[in-house]
Amino acid sequence: MELIVSPEPALKIERRAKLLSVTFARPAENNTLTQQTLNELSRAFDDAERDPACRIVLLEGSGGYFCTGMDFREMTSRSTHDQRSTGDIHYMDLLRRIATTGLVVISAVDGQVMAGGIGIVAASDLVLATPASRFSLPEALWGLLPACVLPLLIRRIGFQNSYRMTLTTETMTARQSLEAGLVDELADSLDDAVRRRSLRLTRLDQETVRRMKAYFQKMWYLSDATYETAVNEIEPLVRDPRIQENIRNFVEHKRFPWEKIG
């Protein structure tokens, strides 16, 4: 008889009164986003939205990492002939859900946020961060673009700030991120900041928040076509043999594209 071992959960989920705490729980892997992680996030939002008492979803990291984007090991295992990357579609669906759900989504950041993690932060309703937190979009170093991140990031911090992050791939401090509008509040104690914000936010019902988000989205350029454009832009890049090789060399040898072999 073959023993089937279930994978360890990618998320730690805890209910606190009217708040659902969702913690990225793969710090040894820098809290990257795997298909398993995306599936668990989808189920967590399903459960929270079905609960009429729930008002807030709190997203947190662990081990010095909030979230560092798509998992490179999983990405390199995809066939270059895949017609559509399921992971990219599910990631885009996650960002859309955060931006439209009737729940208030708070990202509480204590550590590093990179790549797709920036998209989660940008889509969130409120972003709280400790002074030690850092934010970056390093995709261009491997020949990729943060295509799925940018619609939400531009909405939050504007065109030039988003373009600068994408072009330079430089890391922004928590203070710089606050000044750019990516972070809403710096706090030494995230627990205290969340508790203070929750006192008023838990008084809003889900339908009010849903209508609020829907109306604000009408005031911006986000649409089904925008999201589709983002996914269509990233798909040929993740299938490109050159980019696949760049990522594979980094995964297997910790070698960046500009570093020559031997």
Regions found by a protein language model. Name each.
Residues 128-133, 183-228, 258-262:
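C-terminal long alpha-helix characteristic of the crotonase
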Residues 1-62, 199:
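Conserved CoA-thioester-binding segment of acyl-CoA-metabolizing enzymes
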Residues 95-142, 171:
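Glycine-rich beta-to-alpha active-site loop
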Residues 1-7, 248-262:
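Terminal low-complexity tails and localization/encapsulation signals of metabolic enzymes
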Residues 150-160:
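Hydrophobic, secondary-structure "cap" segments at the distal end of domains
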Residues 61-97:
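Glycine- (often His-adjacent) and acidic-residue-rich active-site loop
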